[in-house]
């Protein structure tokens, strides 16, 4: 890409970050690519983005684990009681008797959620031991070798089925958002990088202006002695020298502030010397097609997944409000149990155990409360649908505007480079003309201002080119240079300590 090769400022690039002893401490010389890579690797913003990804990953893992069989064991070992309790006799009288016993029990429990129906199926086995002290006491074992239990809601909302639809979208959304935020870290690095370049250029401009102002002031003093220039022009040049001193002080303070901002963002101690991108634009596109960018964005960006998730959550709320009109639950248990004074006997001559329960709750008079809840959910769904349509239009519009801005930026950069060259030539010509002839101070001031603005605009347009490019990458999650999706090894990232 010849355009960026021609338009870059004459600074030497380096293949790797290097530290050189300059001034009071070491200096870290960075190219733009190295700055972006460092920001993605060690900036605070990148660490926050990774933390959010890890949170979403483990939430996804917890959801998947919730669908798998769960095995649990519970026990009480021991349970000792020595107390008096009330006892009702056969004739209806109540007396207090002394209880003195030692109990042990344990159970193994396996449960599985049934997502198609929303119920829970479990298998349980347990053993209880009781030792009664005192006269007539002894040992007693009670076993439950196996018991099968089903708990099933009927006509209710199937939360498992809805979560099975929504949770994968949440995780996919988190992955896409992480990739977008990674590109946004690059965008922030680009802005801070070029802000420092621009601040350094402003210092250079201020020093050049001060040097030229002092030269012109000396020339004006000589001309004043010869009577070829007015006292007013000499005073104006003296004022220009003072203003140039002030501008240099301000620009140096601004450069230090920009230096600190980039160092803090990259989490480095050394002074940073940014290298203006020279030749790094080779291979990047000069023109992007809106339909192609939009297609990649709709496929990869978190926005598309967010729209589907929000629509599904709105449907879920409506379904839950409708299911809240009545509640019916089925509970069924089948198994075997045995009792004996010895452990082996507790597993012989087993007796069957069956429990069936159907519980229901039907509102008779609620004064329209449940109907109101359903209407609220339906209204909220309509609001969400309207918001999603509006946001989809804005999403497409923003991509169109950004694509047009990027496509126009190459021409803007070419114009800025040419304007910088012309403004510098005009400035030099005016300075030499003043030294050897006569030219108004207004012309010199105007040439100085135009030269300064053109040089800064040249850097700004180069900044916009890179910023727009990475902004399109962050939206489409597509590497336009390599022609492939922007991806990451999520499993490796989240498991990195």
PLM region spans:
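Acidic, low-complexity, intrinsically disordered peripheral segments
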Residues: 11-25, 72, 79-84, 270-276, ...
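Hydrophobic h-region of N-terminal signal peptides that target proteins for export
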Residues: 3-12
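Metallo-beta-lactamase
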Residues: 251, 302, 384, 461
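Interdomain signal-transducing alpha-helical coiled-coil linkers
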Residues: 160, 164, 367-370, 374
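A small-residue-enriched
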Residues: 37-155, 187, 268, 294-372, ...
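Amphipathic alpha-helical coiled-coil segments
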Residues: 48-63, 181, 185-206, 215, ...
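Periplasmic alpha-helical coiled-coil/stalk elements that build and connect Gram-negative outer-membrane
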Residues: 30, 165-171, 175-296, 405, ...
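Regulatory alphaC helix of protein kinase catalytic domains
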Residues: 21-36
